[in-house]
Amino acid sequence: MVEIYYDDDANLDNLADRKVAVIGFGSQGHAHALNLRDSGVDVRVGLPETSTSRAKAEEQGLRVVTPAEASAEADIIMILTPDTTHRKIYAESIAPHLTPGKALAFGHGFNIRYGLIEPPAGVDVFMVAPKGPGHLVRRVFVEGKGVPVLVAVEADATGKALDIALAYAKGIGGTRAGALRTTFTEETETDLFGEQAVLCGGASALVQAGFETLVEAGYTPEVAYFECLHELKLIVDLMYEGGISQMRYSISDTAEYGDVTRGPRVITPAVKAEMRKILDEIQDGTFAREWVAEDDAGRATFTKLVEEGKQHPIEQVGGKLRPMMSWIAKD
């Protein structure tokens, strides 16, 4: 069973004499920095002088310096920029200041898991990964609650890495809900698999295939959109709130019978075997090497595939239908 830590298991005193640098001020960066500050932690935000986020951070009363200056000052350096930027930021701004006794922290394990960043000996390496977007991490913190987090320690040079990680988790509100102990490997591999096979890749492909099946059979694209994309949120919300069983309890008997008898015909053993292949590529580094090479080469294939996806008929149909829905229509 997983170890779960709560407020009583974490002590903010472990951050009392430590300066924290949050590198980045995006979704997670702004939440971490503001929550830590409100928890009494000495925090600064590291952003390039050309960053448009500098003004946003300063407006929130945060001290903003360059990533290099933040890394030089801080005892704990948390990197919260996109994965593909980590290597450059680390090499140019962090590594020169990563002296023994400091801690390097991450919100996702990708670069450590695949050896893209190799911290020196004498440095603690830990991860605190909220299981929710930054705006939620900030909002519930202000409400006196918290979002669950994953906590992992990759290197414990000081013998205090877990204590520091838990203190950090408490500082952003994570231990109010619970901090689940994991590893960089487990967090990275399961996160990538979930994105690729279920949450993003799997769900997107399933929705498109269902839409195509109905339209090719002669049904109107607008009705197909409602049945295969729009109503997905209704089902996912039920699953999110109470699990699959609660979702099945909440739908009609006809829908439930179709679920339990036809669902396995869609997600067949062959589909599950393909999921296993995807997991294998994550575990053996194939996906990471492919993605890093694609990013380094300028993302031509990636961009092409994304643009092709935008041309799918379901996008045009949705663009026409969503303005009908006042609760989701955008200005």
UniProtKB/Swiss-Prot annotation:
Residues covered by the KARI C-terminal knotted domain: 183-328
Enzyme active site: H108
A single BP term in Gene Ontology: L-valine biosynthetic process
Pfam assignment, any one: KARI_C
Annotated catalysed reactions: (2R)-2,3-dihydroxy-3-methylbutanoate + NADP(+) = (2S)-2-acetolactate + NADPH + H(+); (2R,3R)-2,3-dihydroxy-3-methylpentanoate + NADP(+) = (S)-2-ethyl-2-hydroxy-3-oxobutanoate + NADPH + H(+)
Cofactor: how and how many bound: Binds 2 magnesium ions per subunit.
Essential cofactor(s): Mg(2+)
EC code: 1.1.1.86
Residues holding NADP(+): F25, G26, S27, Q28, S51, S53, G134
Positions of Mg(2+) 1 binding: D191, E195
GO MF annotation, one: NADP binding
InterPro entries, per database record: 6-PGluconate_DH-like_C_sf (IPR008927), KARI (IPR013023), KARI_C (IPR000506), KARI_N (IPR013116), KARI_prok (IPR014359), NAD(P)-bd_dom_sf (IPR036291)
Pathway the protein takes part in: Amino-acid biosynthesis; L-isoleucine biosynthesis; L-isoleucine from 2-oxobutanoate: step 2/4; Amino-acid biosynthesis; L-valine biosynthesis; L-valine from pyruvate: step 2/4
Swiss-Prot/TrEMBL keywords: Amino-acid biosynthesis, Branched-chain amino acid biosynthesis, Magnesium, Metal-binding, NADP, Oxidoreductase
Primary role: Involved in the biosynthesis of branched-chain amino acids (BCAA). Catalyzes an alkyl-migration followed by a ketol-acid reduction of (S)-2-acetolactate (S2AL) to yield (R)-2,3-dihydroxy-isovalerate. In the isomerase reaction, S2AL is rearranged via a Mg-dependent methyl migration to produce 3-hydroxy-3-methyl-2-ketobutyrate (HMKB). In the reductase reaction, this 2-ketoacid undergoes a metal-dependent reduction by NADPH to yield (R)-2,3-dihydroxy-isovalerate.
Designated name of the protein: Ketol-acid reductoisomerase (NADP(+))
Annotated organism of origin: Parafrankia sp. (strain EAN1pec)
Organism lineage string: Bacteria, Bacillati, Actinomycetota, Actinomycetes, Frankiales
